[in-house]
């Protein structure tokens, strides 16, 4: 099923800028910050890329998508349901515990947490990377040029605000499928 998904994405004109095999070992143990997230199409493109660069890639998706027949398919594809409304749901702790087991694990998260414009990104992706001691790897969705690629790893410094500003500043409004839904950081 994954190969079919990747093939369909390529047929839609997407170019995957893939690192040379084995050249980026950090891609097997990291948190991907995938942005700009302004469309449901981000999921199709992002997962097709993740499956090509990770040995064990997981994608966090809001639980509402798991209702009905799509649920088993999403679980089979390595997706994890997120209950964003439940404060008792410790997804950061669960993700950190998974990393602590060792071995390949990469988690893709859209830090905006919504396809709507947001001024403040969610902090969970930073917390997971910081607590697990793994890098954050920016993953760029460029709808204008139909390209997706990853940037250099960013290790958390302990200064969440500075790290978030650094990461957010990498993503540009013109890359988004719906630029009006992405709030770019002004330098």
PLM features: what roles do these ranges have?
Residues 14-173, 187:
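Soluble catalytic domains of membrane acyltransferases
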Residues 1-18:
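Extreme N-terminal tail/first-helix region
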